[in-house]
Amino acid sequence: MIFGISEPVAFVCFFVYGSFFEWTLHKYLMHQPRWLYPFRAHALVHHGLFRTGEQYFLSDPKVIRKVRFAWWHAPFIILLHMPVIFWLQDMLALNILGGALSALILYYFLYEYLHYCMHIPKGRWLEKTFWFRWLDSHHHMHHKRHFNNLNVVLPIADIFFGTLIPAKEHLATPNREAGAQQVSLLLSAS
C-alpha cells in the first residue's frame, strides 16, 4: 500500500458518504418508533424540547445534554464503519484508512458542534457566517417538518432524496441574538 492521492480522495468520498449516512440514520432510526431508543431520545425528547421559533433555543439548562448524542455514539459509529473501511482498503489495495477515519470523525464532530450552536446560540463568530445561518435555517425547518431537511452538516442527501425544502423564513438576527441572551442568562443562573 502506498500513500498518495488515495487518502485525500478517501476523505472526500467518506465526507460525502457522511451526508447519506446521517440522512439514513436520522430518517430510519431517529424518526421511526420501531427503534425505541433513538426514536425516544430524538423524535420525542429532542423535538419535544426544541421546537420552532423561540422554542428552537435552549430554554432550560437542565436539558442541555439533550442537544448532543450520548458519549458512546461516536466510537460506535466509527467501529461500525471499520469492517467496510478495511474491506475497501484491501479490495482497492490503497491506503484509505486515514482519509476515511478523518472524514467520519470530522463529520461527526461538525454534526455535534453545529447542532449544539444551532440550539444554544452564544453569538459565536461561526453563528454569524452565511454558511452557518443557511444550515441553521435548514435545520430550523426540520424542526417544523420532521421528515424534511434531515441533514445538519451537508445536505447533499436531502437534495438527492428530495427531502430538502428551502427555509421560507430565516431565523432573523434578532431571534438568534435574543436566543443567545436567553441562553446566557439561563446558563449563568444555573
Regions found by a protein language model. Give the residues of each.
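A membrane-cytosol interface segment of integral membrane proteins
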Residues: 182-190
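Hydrophobic alpha-helical transmembrane segments
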Residues: 1-12, 92-102
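Membrane-embedded catalytic scaffold of the fatty acid hydroxylase/desaturase
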Residues: 18-101, 105-179
